[in-house]
């Protein structure tokens, strides 16, 4: 089982070729443990299945609400945007606090990242930065050396797979991302180093 952070496209692709059963877990500090699993082998849909005696719903924001009586007597309200399939199944879309509002259009960075993931080998993320006209503009932040003109052009061709407002307006290269003690990318810390 894998958990602690969403499983990357590259890792999921590598796992799909191995003769083992692999699962991504969903959990958070408030739930103490994982409350749902998603098969990483043979399943094309990215659907989490809750564990026994756990049900889920979505609040008015579209965020996951967890009902797990053995863990908490109160529902646990998250900031995770989901597509609810049933009271026992959901698709994780991203974090509501990461949503980019660009020209009045709400963009989920994690959705854009999943589309671009098979075109990039280095670590990257999608972010919103202040823009006088749009409020926020979408940017692609890449770890490593600055891209060559040819690499940039190739990458921009892949942007065509995205919806118009999801397409990054700029590509920012940073030699090393800021990280948490556990190795997760600190998006805000990384962006702050650019300013």
Language-model features: locations:
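Generic structural signal for well-ordered beta-strand positions
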Residues: 65, 91-93, 180, 186
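AMP-binding/adenylate-forming core of the ANL superfamily
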Residues: 55-77, 81-83, 89
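AMP-binding/adenylate-forming catalytic core of the ANL superfamily
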Residues: 76-166
